[in-house]
Swiss-Prot record:
Family matches, as InterPro entries: Rtr1/RPAP2 (IPR039693), Rtr1/RPAP2_dom (IPR007308), Rtr1/RPAP2_sf (IPR038534)
UniProt-annotated binding residues for Zn(2+): 69, 74, 105, 109
Subcellular location: Nucleus
Function (record text): Putative RNA polymerase II subunit B1 C-terminal domain (CTD) phosphatase involved in RNA polymerase II transcription regulation.
Catalysis performed (reactions): O-phospho-L-seryl-[protein] + H2O = L-seryl-[protein] + phosphate; O-phospho-L-threonyl-[protein] + H2O = L-threonyl-[protein] + phosphate
Protein name: Putative RNA polymerase II subunit B1 CTD phosphatase RPAP2 homolog
Amino acid sequence: MTTEKGEQLRQQLIAAVVKKRAAIARAHEIVVRLLEPGIPEPEFLSLLCEIGPPNYSDIVDEREINKLCGYPLCSTVLENVPKQKYSISASKNKVYDITERKKFCSGYCFKASEYIKSQVPTSPLWLRDRETRPSFQLLPRNT
């Protein structure tokens, strides 16, 4: 009887590992897909539930490396990217770290990307089938 339980537990563990690997591989496929310019909005929103925040950060970083705006729905090519890490505002007497901001073509794209990133589920990818599918909202254009 203990060997039956042991074998059953072993099979469950193997199934869980296979499921985990498949979810991670699917997330990687989505990252690669979202590196391309011209992603349709409905497709983008449908793919978000299958990735996690680290995957989304990878998308932004890889798009920047490819000289594309980090926001997956934007196809703008990045030109004249500032080389400095900080921006100094003399009028506000502040220093701003622009490391993340310079991955985007505009303030809107930066805000929209951060808005989406805040909605991406943080639960493990392989356990998402037990959750209700979230509904993602895009940042309106006039903000």
